[in-house]
Each structure stands twice: as structure tokens, then as C-alpha cells.
Design a protein with these regions (language model features):
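Juxtamembrane intracellular "pre-TM" segments in multi-pass secondary transporters
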Residues: 55-61, 241-273
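Conserved MFS/SLC helix-loop-helix module at the cytosolic interface between two early adjacent transmembrane helices
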Residues: 116-154
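Helix-to-loop junctions at the C-terminal end of transmembrane segments
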Residues: 118-129, 317-331, 415
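Helix-loop-helix hairpin linking two adjacent transmembrane segments in secondary transporters
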Residues: 156, 193-240
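Intracellular juxtamembrane helix-capping segments at the cytosolic ends
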Residues: 170-182, 372-385
């Protein structure tokens, strides 16, 4: 700091920015110099709000509720892109003049896209800037939503659905963030908060798209989805800090490490497999619900199908509560409970298939059962490999959505062959396989 930083004007010092120091130089009294130097230093050392991109979260040090809430909300809006189409399948089928099987493929392809995004995009969170990955994915998802809204052929919808599914994996970047940076005692709880936002988005997407489809048609829903993605991009820039990467190396080496994790961690394989079959069981009921309710005695429109999504709020509530008790009761017990609940749900769905009360009960039970399995097993995977949380979550969620895609695909074939009873059989089989894996694991551990 030099005396040239200050210029007396009308008997009072005028403080000039330091970058003018080299341009002006003149003499001043020592007293004036000391006083002005003190004032200038007070300006330079004043506490400033640290920019979001300079904030660094520390592992196990805690994460603010504001960031958690933002991640939960954005997770809900982003994952909704994968589920807007479910109540609209009948409208899309009629508008594009395709069969029910072709319309059902939209849901299947979206889930496949999500699985591809989980496998190829989520691991990048250990290698590159997570915030940048999130921004790019939301931008592409917004563009693909516009493509779907303007599509005139089913093949265009299929292609855009594949991409929008792959780019809607943002919540699966948020979940490892919550697991890695939360305090150890709050990890499962905070993962549950983000997961409850994700589930709320799934439920709300079905309700909103059902009503928008009933009143405005199916195309405006995807224009709305594009606008929501742009808003989420702005919120992400303002709220989410950047984070240090967890992996040093190239993308090829990163992907190779996935295979090493698969081979070296049998618990991750088990957790992912049983949760995947459970998710396939849950999606089986949703993938054919629009077709079932369009038949007598319901003859319901897309708005009624969307309203059923509200029944799944039990799953979101369960996710926000289960996290508190996973550490106490263990993953095995939650997996047993979830498998049994799913089988019970499908029995209700079959016996009371011509009743709204029966279908609502089945949806509630199957959602709660699924969340028992997902949250407990997903938390276990992330906590087993905290330094590779994105890759551990990649393996879990890729398997999870492969199971979901398989369940959706099998349910679609079953509907063509035997309508709702055949769909119920598919759901029971998937739930039974999940439960069997848990029982076999329990017997091996006791042996």
C-alpha cells in the first residue's frame, strides 16, 4: 500500500482502489498516512460472502439443511422427466396411432436410458466437477423434452426418451453427496431426505402429467418439463457448491475400477440385485396401470391414473422415516420386510383388481415395500465405499434400473397375453426373487 492510494479532496481523504497506486504518487504527513493505511486495510480485510463455487464440503463434516433441501427439490423435478409419460401412454398411443405394446416401450426405453446414464454418467462424479455434470444433464434433458413435445412419430419419442432418461440421473449424483459429506450419525437420514424428494417428484409427476394430459393434451406436459429444467439449472448455480473429485486418472481407468468393485464387494452385488428385483416388481404395477384403468369397470382417463400417484406418497414418507432406523435394525430385516410387503401388495392387486380401494391399497403397500429395500440397501452400498461413493451408487442404481426395465418389459408382454392377472403374476415373481435372495443370504450368514 502506498500513499498514492489516497488523494485529499476538500480537506478529506478520498479512498481510491489499490489498482490506482502505481499511477499517482505524492507526499503526505506520517499521521495522515497511518490513518489512511488503517482505513484501507479495513476495507481489504472486510469479511465477504464466499462464492458458491469456492465453498468446499468436507467428508463427514456435515452438510447444511439448505443444500439438502435444494438437492431434494431438484432431484424431484429431474427424476420426474422419466415418469411424465406413464399416465399419458394411452393419449400418446391414440395420437401417434400405435399399439399398446409400442406405447409401453416408451416407458421401457426411458428406464433403459436411465440405466445407461447411471452406468456411464454417474461415475464421472468421482472424476469431474459434479456441478458441471448436473448442469449439462439438465440442459440436454430440457432439449429432449422439447423434442418429445414436437414429435410426430413414435420412433422420435423412443429416441428422445432414451436420452432424457440418461440425463435424468441427477438425483443419483445428489445421493452420494449426502452420504459422503454428512456427519456419520446423519448419513442415512440425509440420504432419506434426498430420496424422499426424488420419490415425491415421481409421485407428483404422475399426478401433474395426468391432469395436464386430460385438460391440455400430452404434448404441453413436456414443454412444461423443459421450463422446469431451466429453472433447476438456475437454482443449481446459486445453491450447490463445487466439490473435490475422488479419483485421479482417466475415464477409462475410472470405468475399469467399476469391475474391480463388482468383483471385490459381494455385499454390493447382493444389495443391488435384491433391490433391483423389488423395483421391477413396483414398476410392473405402474407400467400397465393406465391400460388397466382404461378398461371396464373403470373406463378412466389419464387424470385418474395420475391421481393414483398421490397414493404413493406413503413411499416418500417411508423414505424420510426409514433412514433413522436402518442403523438400528439392519439392512437384512428391512429387506425381509420389504419383500413380504410387495408380495402382499400383489395379492391385494389381484384379488381386488376391479376396485379403486384395492388398487390404491396395492400401490401404497408396494411403494412402502420398495422403499424399505431401496433406502436400506443403497445406504449400505454407499457407506461400504465412501471414497468411491459415486461408483458404488452407479453399480447399485444401474442394477436397480435394469431390474425396473426388466419388470416393465415383462409386465408389458404379460398385459398383451393375459391382461391384469398376468401382470400380477409378473409382480409376484419379481418380489419373490428379491425375497429369496435375502433369505438365502440370511441362511449363509447363520451357517
Amino acid at each position: 500500500m502506498t500513499l498514492s492510494d489516497f488523494q485529499p479532496v476538500l480537506g478529506r481523504p478520498n479512498i481510491r482502489p489499490p489498482h490506482f497506486a502505481s499511477k499517482v504518487s505524492y507526499n503526505a504527513s506520517p499521521q495522515t498516512s497511518d490513518e489512511c493505511t488503517r482505513i484501507a486495510l479495513s476495507f481489504s480485510t472486510a469479511k465477504r460472502k464466499e462464492p458458491t463455487d469456492m465453498i468446499q464440503l468436507k467428508e463427514n463434516a456435515g452438510i447444511s439443511m439448505g443444500i439438502l433441501t435444494a438437492m431434494a427439490v431438484i432431484a424431484g423435478f429431474t427424476v420426474a422427466n422419466c415418469y411424465y409419460n406413464q399416465p399419458l401412454l394411452e393419449l400418446i398411443r391414440a395420437d401417434l396411432h400405435v399399439s399398446e405394446a409400442q406405447a409401453n416401450l416408451i416407458t421401457v426405453i426411458t428406464q433403459i436410458g436411465y440405466a445407461l446414464g447411471l452406468f456411464f454418467i454417474i461415475p464421472m462424479g468421482d472424476l469431474y466437477s459434479r456441478r458441471r455434470i448436473i448442469m449439462v444433464n439438465m440442459l440436454v434433458a430440457a432439449l429432449m423434452a422439447v423434442v418429445i413435445a414436437t414429435a410426430g412419430h413414435i420412433a422420435v419419442v423412443w429416441g428422445a426418451s432414451l436420452i432424457i432418461g440418461a440425463c435424468s440421473v441427477v438425483p443419483q449424483i445428489f445421493i452420494p453427496i449426502a452420504g459422503q459429506f454428512s456427519e456419520p450419525a446423519n448419513k442415512s437420514r440425509n440420504i432419506g431426505i434426498v430420496l424422499s424428494g426424488l420419490l415425491t417428484g415421481i409421485l407428483a409427476s404422475r399426478v401433474v402429467s395426468g391432469y395436464v394430459g386430460n385438460w391440455l393434451g400430452w404434448r404441453p406436459m413436456f414443454f412444461i418439463a423443459a421450463v422446469l429444467m431451466v429453472v433447476c439449472m438456475g437454482v443449481t448455480l446459486m445453491v450447490l457448491p463445487d466439490m473435490k473429485r475422488n479419483f485421479e486418472g482417466r475415464y477409462a481407468a475410472l470405468m475399469k475400477s467399476l469391475w474391480q468393485i463388482v468383483c471385490g464387494h459381494p455385499r454390493i452385488r447382493l444389495n443391488a440385485a435384491r433391490a433391483g428385483f423389488a423395483f421391477g416388481s413396483m414398476l410392473a404395477i405402474w407400467s400397465c396401470m393406465a391400460f388397466h384403468l382404461a378398461q371396464p369397470p373403470f373406463c378412466a382417463g389419464s387424470d385418474k391414473v395420475g391421481m393414483l400417484g398421490l397414493c404413493g406418497v406413503a413411499g416418500a414418507i417411508a423414505a424420510s422415516r426409514i433412514g433413522k432406523y436402518v442403523h438400528r435394525f439392519g439392512v437384512h430385516r428391512f429387506s425381509l420386510c420389504g419383500g413380504c410387503l410387495q408380495i402382499l401388495a400383489w395379492m391385494v392387486a389381484y384379488v381386488f383388481r376391479d376396485s379403486y380401494v384395492g388398487l390404491i391399497s396395492a400401490v401404497v403397500i408396494v411403494d412402502v415395500g420398495t422403499q424399505c429395500l431401496q433406502l436400506s440397501n443403497q445406504s449400505a452400498c454407499i457407506q461400504e465405499l465412501p471414497q468411491a461413493s459415486n461408483r458404488a451408487n452407479t453399480l447399485f442404481m444401474t442394477t436397480y434400473f435394469i431390474g425396473g426395465s426388466l419388470g416393465t418389459f415383462c409386465a408389458g408382454i404379460a398385459w398383451e397375453r393375459g391382461a391384469w392377472p398376468a401382470v400380477c403374476l409378473v409382480g409376484v415373481v419379481f418380489a419373490a426373487v428379491s425375497l429369496a435372495l435375502t433369505l438365502i443370504d440370511g441362511w449363509r450368514r447363520r451357517a
